[in-house]
Amino acid sequence: MTPADLADLLRTTATAVLTERDLDTAALPATVTVERPRNPEHGDYATNLALQVGKKVGVNPRELAGWLAEALTAAAGIASAEVAGPGFVNLRIEAAAQNVIVGDIITSAERYGHSAALAERNINLEFVSANPTGPIHIGGTRWAAVGDALGRLLATQGAAVVREYYFNDHGAQIDRFVSSLIAAAKGEPTPEDGYAGSYIGDIAAQVLAKDPGALELPDGEMRETFRAIGVDLMFDHIKISLHDFGTDFDVFTHEDSMHTSGRVEEAIARLRENGAIYEKDGATWLRTTDFGDDKDRVVIKSDGAPAYIAGDLAYFLDKRQRGFDLCIYMLGADHHGYIARLKAAAAALGDDPDTVEVMIGQMVNLVRDGQPVRMSKRAGTVITLDDLVEAIGVDAARYSLIRSSVDTPIDIDLALWSSASNENPVYYVQYAHARLSALARNAADLGVVADTARLDLLTHDKEGTLIRNLGEFPRVLESAAALREPHRVCRYLEDLAGDYHRFYDSCRVLPQGDEAPGSLHQARLALCQATRQVIANGLAILGVSAPERM
């Protein structure tokens, strides 16, 4: 009996209890929840349904809890149901009913935990979208990990997800990048507002290798040559870094295409039709204050050039015309103002602002020997994705960045995350998987085969704790997807790994010496197989490897 099965049983039972007493069943919540008590002595699961419903139907919650407990005790699979406190019901599940979870996991395999909760959603997930003027910095690296994990997580719940990178190749930052390349190619100092770092010299040399006469061209042609070749080279490096990090995108959209394809003009025309823009001081303004923004925004500057928000408007319109019903933007800590701005832009275009969702990620700091690490050797300024991977590896880098809520700044201790110790969270989880894999190999050598026929033999309290935690995995995925919080998967896996290690220390899985394999060995091996599957499924969502050996 899974937590979902128990919740369904509880709702059915509550409906019958209320109906029998001529009480209003409409008072029942659409979704009934059960929770695992912190204290195991309080049972396997608990519910506060009587507290939710009692006053609505004019019954003392504790009395209603008593009715529910009496009815539940008679239900198949329920070992006991007891009233606690002002109206809680504590439940214990019969081992045979509870242990069905193990068979469900083995049968479902890599699809265990998946659901159709978001099957109707067509989601555009835009993340990283770093300027093509340098390597991806540590903040963008956080989004590369979290965004990719979120995309995988949403997909487990049935959503159609497109991972998109918005390529900012239009604007002043590209002009500064080009000036920096040309200065490096000429052997001149970096311009005052330019980009430093050895990568600039590397790219400048590659531009000259592709077009040896680039510096001899007229100024306009020279700049265009360095722009076209240099931006492509930089973006190729970014794509390779992301791919090596385990993050790939379905779509790359060029900001410049919004301006060259007529998308910006189309968006402006839509705004004019909606009466959402006006002229002032020679510029064209968007009435974003009418839709919740803190001030109106310039769309077309007084010199006739589109402002940055013009591209944002066109890009949102483009996404909606491609059929996405939810557009998630994952932005850096300095973009809080974009939440109201993007929602206002959607409303001004005549769309539902709830089709826009903005996630803001906080800062990431690296620490070595108790001191902050601030300088990248290659970029010359901030720490990059490549720096982090070089220091602790892809798995530890991804896990460390996903493990905390995105609205929390994080410090990554390089010594901790590169250590082979239980204090290293990713090592702790991966070691559990490797230990389970070794157990499977040893079982094969001994001729022990996992069997779900006698799961009723799994009655040890450590077995029950592990099984109940395995049953939580679908709910963890559903809530993590709904809340856009993939860090919940990390915390769950660490908790599950702990339950497994405690089970393994208390319950011998394989026969020893001349002992013949028995049904209990087979049932425990099935439990280990299910645990290994769930850990592998969780790590796959995070984009972290599940090693067979460590």
Curated annotation (Swiss-Prot):
Keywords: Aminoacyl-tRNA synthetase, ATP-binding, Cytoplasm, Ligase, Nucleotide-binding, Protein biosynthesis. Its main location: cytoplasm. Coiled coil: none annotated. It catalyses: tRNA(Arg) + L-arginine + ATP = L-arginyl-tRNA(Arg) + AMP + diphosphate. It holds the Pfam family DALR_1. InterPro entries: aa-tRNA-synth_I_CS, Arg-tRNA-ligase, Arg-tRNA-synth_N, Arg-tRNA-synth_N_sf, ArgRS_core, DALR_anticod-bd, Rossmann-like_a/b/a_fold, tRNAsynth_Ia_anticodon-bd. GO terms for cellular component: cytoplasm. GO terms for biological process: arginyl-tRNA aminoacylation. PROSITE patterns: AA_TRNA_LIGASE_I. It comes from the Bacteria. GO terms for molecular function: arginine-tRNA ligase activity; ATP binding. Signal peptide: none annotated. It is found in: Cytoplasm. A motif ('HIGH' region) lies at residues 130-140. Its EC number is 6.1.1.19. Belongs to the class-I aminoacyl-tRNA synthetase family. Monomer. This is Arginine--tRNA ligase. The gene is argS.
